[in-house]
Amino acid sequence: MWRVARSAASTFRRTRRLSTAISAPCIVHKRGADILHDPWFNKDTGFPMTERDRLGLRGLLPPRVISFEQQYDRFMESFRSLEKNTEGQPDSVVSLAKWRILNRLHDRNETLYYRVLIDNIKDFAPIIYTPTVGLVCQNYSGLFRRPRGMYFSAKDKGEMMSMIFNWPSTQVDMIVLTDGSRILGLGDLGVQGIGIPIGKLDMYVAAAGINPQRVLPVMLDVGTNNQKLLEDPLYLGLRQPRLEGEEYLSIVDEFVEAVHARWPKAVVQFEDFQAKWAFETLDRYRKKFCMFNDDIQGTAGVALAGLLGTVRAQGRPLTDFANQKIVVVGAGSAGLGVLKMALQAVSRMTGPSADPHFFLLDKNGLITKDRKDIDPAALPFAKAHHEIEGLGLQEGAGLAEVVKKVKPHVLLGLSGVGGIFHEEVLRAMKESDSVRPAIFAMSNPTNNAECCPVDAFKLAGEDIVFASGSPFANVDLGNGKIGHVNQANNMYLFPGIGLGALLSGARNISDTMLEAAAECLASYMSDDEINRGILYPSIDDIRDITAEVGAAVLRAAVAEDLAEGHGDVGVKELQHMSKEETIEHVRQNMWYPVYGPLVHE
């Protein structure tokens, strides 16, 4: 069975260096129809005749052997036909139809699925990841056909240490975990949030080359406060209100301990937890396990890379970042994470007495120290009265007023409120103190974006730098000019963070490792690209980006003495690698989908 299958790659390592590039055989414990029903090993009609005999498949498949390339072309033809047949239909209908055809392939043949995904990442990432994954989560109970990942619920308390051994793979490198409490900008989706870990891990495989047999999407179901779901007869999760307080934390504790007991070297990514639990769990586990929270730390890294890019676009040295006036709208885990990492960057530039020009707003307006019952996580970024009285601002000031009076260099949205950067706000950005103001509308999915790029370029000026969380087309400004739309999405960082942490064998993921990832991404773009307003690379280059980010994270782990090595590569070998050798080492450890020979044991 695939659950105990193992690769003979290590046995063949030296041989492969001296011979032709033949994939190492994989030893399996299945035969016949069981192989055909296993998406990891199934090759459909691609099994050669010798393998059909070896695995008891002769007669179970049509006699013609179809090559991998022919299978690939056949799927792409079907996909293009679907695109043609759904022309003119609502976007949601088309998106779900595309997701279904990809999901059917994923359920049947993972090797072909990931090759299709890697080769067409620009077209398919928006389907298996943001923004379509949000639509999938909203409809998950109705779309459910085949389980993927593991589900731990409040009813499993006391059983998780044994449950973890129900997962069939003996080795897991990467886990993405959610409790479904804050899915994108869609709120509490309960168990239906499992679509997020699945989509994230698809990106880990496609971008970071994590072996798909070693990934595990996890849903931690502690109930839901979404009344619509509780009343839905098709809802697949627990029909109870969410656990809170120590009851909640005891469930998360038990799961984390179970994972660490079975796979102590696995990297765990926390995803889409509501803000209070996102910060609580990050503080609780980050020094004990190799884990990170993508909403807090991944989003922050991508945003910081873009913010540093805007300084370059203004023709200023990076040290001038300390003088940038930044208005952040959204005081959840993502917005606070961005400010925390930005503050760390300013402190490195100016010293511990840094006095950043950050202004934070939530649904109640500008956050100041005069606010009652202020969130402790927001307190470091709350403005004192003397800091804003000269601007004519006070507690609770609205967004338009803040932008008009602060005249920020950067307006950054992580509010989850679509259209909050309305006409008055965008026109006010035209009066920014910056020669090239930046607008980051980073909320996902598309409908939750704070503004669309067309409005931003029209109302705030053609010289702005623009970035969004979801993909948008570039804007035709006329006269041959293009308004470049950057996708400031975590996919540029989290695969590299996870890969670098894994290959270094890091005991935990430090702020320095995360900052190394952000700075690597920030330096990836050329001066010419930055001058044209292009802050982030093309997603077509995602594997190259991830290799460089992963290498930067690995080097940072080694420098901080957090690395313990991975596989047969120890810490001493990692220490002696040059920058170029580290990048090559990372590339060599990225899985790529090909049909390898299967040997039954």
UniProtKB/Swiss-Prot annotation:
It catalyses: (S)-malate + NAD(+) = pyruvate + CO2 + NADH. A divalent metal cation binds at E271, D272, D295. Gene3D superfamilies: Malic enzyme, N-terminal domain, NAD(P)-binding Rossmann-like Domain. Residues 1-18 form a transit peptide. Its main location: mitochondrion. It holds the Pfam family Malic_M. Keywords: Metal-binding, Mitochondrion, NAD, Oxidoreductase, Transit peptide. NAD(+) binds at R182, D295, N444. Its EC number is 1.1.1.39. This is NAD-dependent malic enzyme 59 kDa isoform, mitochondrial. It is an enzyme of class 1 (oxidoreductase). One of its GO terms (biological process) is pyruvate metabolic process. One of its GO terms (cellular component) is mitochondrial matrix. Divalent metal cations. Prefers magnesium or manganese. The active site is at Y129 (proton donor), K200 (proton acceptor). Belongs to the malic enzymes family. GO terms for molecular function: malate dehydrogenase (decarboxylating) (NAD+) activity; metal ion binding; NAD binding. Heterodimer of two related subunits. Coiled coil: none annotated. Its cofactor is Mg(2+); Mn(2+). It is found in: Mitochondrion matrix.
